[in-house]
């Protein structure tokens, strides 16, 4: 019987060699060179994390929190290194979605009686 954890670890290593992953890594490295863009990116990540924590605790977001996150997102949309990173994230996400479909297929087959 195959050890699925070994297979998963190999897949993780293989993902690092894909063009999509390499493009994302390069885009992130370039983003870090722009201190203003990287600072905004870090602020956005922190706010997202804080809101996710509140959500997990069943707490509602204040209008100010939502507005602050939206304003920060709006600022980020105009910054080229962030736009580039987001585009590369989409490419990697598409690949990950395709992999998830492949991995999930046996479960789908069970429920479809295959």
From Swiss-Prot:
Residue stretches in coiled coil: none
Superkingdom of source: Bacteria
Signal peptide start and end residues: none
A Pfam match: Com_YlbF
Family designation: Belongs to the UPF0342 family.
The protein's name: UPF0342 protein LCABL_19440
Native species: Lacticaseibacillus casei (strain BL23) (Lactobacillus casei)
